[in-house]
């Protein structure tokens, strides 16, 4: 608000599960209803790596009519066997009333497939595999990279995958 940018969003996790996940979800929904409209309009939910899966977070987002940011790494660490690509269209549809495209977070595990810590860099092969599967939805979306080496990791990823795609600029490609 102080920046006079009305499209800004706040990414949140659902939070704790004291009393069980169903109680935590109910508590989140009840608390959300007390937020001022200007805050409600800025909130987007992200699935987490320990407690609330992508499918649980999606259900909350649909109930509250708010966008969901899908975190791929969190899904890999915390899921109930759901195929993320079967959910992706539904997740992206939570953004239908927004002026901005859907967002996803992508990171690679530091050590081992289920390590919750973020690696310094992005695994280019895994990134390409995800993008090639996601393109079947035929919808623009933004990818936010979460890696310890920040911009250096972005430039390394671009170098790793540059031959796979048509590049619009140094950080934007089309599939």
PLM region descriptions:
Residues 12-14, 25, 36-39, 73-75, ...:
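A generic short-segment signal for beta-strand/edge and adjacent turn/coil regions
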Residues 14-18, 47-51, 72-76, 108-112, ...:
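Active-site-proximal loop/turn and secondary-structure-junction residues that shape catalytic pockets
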Residues 66, 77-175:
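Histidine-acidic metal/acid-base catalytic patches
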Residues 1-63, 67:
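Active-site acidic/histidine proton-transfer and metal-coordination neighborhood
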Residues 45, 70, 145:
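Active-site flanking residues adjacent to catalytic metal/cofactor-binding acidic residues
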